[in-house]
Amino acid sequence: STAAEDGVTDNDGNQIEAANLAPTLQAARMRAQNKSAVRSSAYAFAEGQGGASGSFSVGAMPGDGCAQPKGNTLFPELTKAAFELEIALCPHREPSSMIAINRNAQFRPHTDSGAGAGQSTSLIVGLGTYVGGELVVESETKDIRYKALEFNGWTERHWTMPFEGERFSLVWFT
């Protein structure tokens, strides 16, 4: 396969060779390709067909008065692994302070909210045994399944296309 098919896009839109991806991401991608998807969506599901949708955050909230995400204490190993994955996917990238972890979430068109200053470019990757579920950024459809993508979630409208199966996404940001 080619880098365009398997690679990660850097800040300049250049493809990073698949051989440079984190071995764990490559292994997860191969496992997912060998499984068939089951029907699911972000808003309706049948028992055994993907399950409920939801989102939570991990990381460090800015400012002294902000409560830290509960996900940090509920899932410390996941938090550590997710931040390590960001470094493995994009070693050139300034490490993020937060990660949104989403399961079977189908987001409507939106821009991310925040304090309005200092936010970083978002990094997203899709994981799981699903079909569909592409990310649309300013009307351009992007396949993020086991392919990391950087985009400006604070200024660019983005949303999730319908999907079938179990879909996770990790979104790193500051």
Q: What are these model-derived regions, one by one?
A:
Residues S1-A148, W154-T174:
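Fe(II)/2-oxoglutarate oxygenase catalytic core
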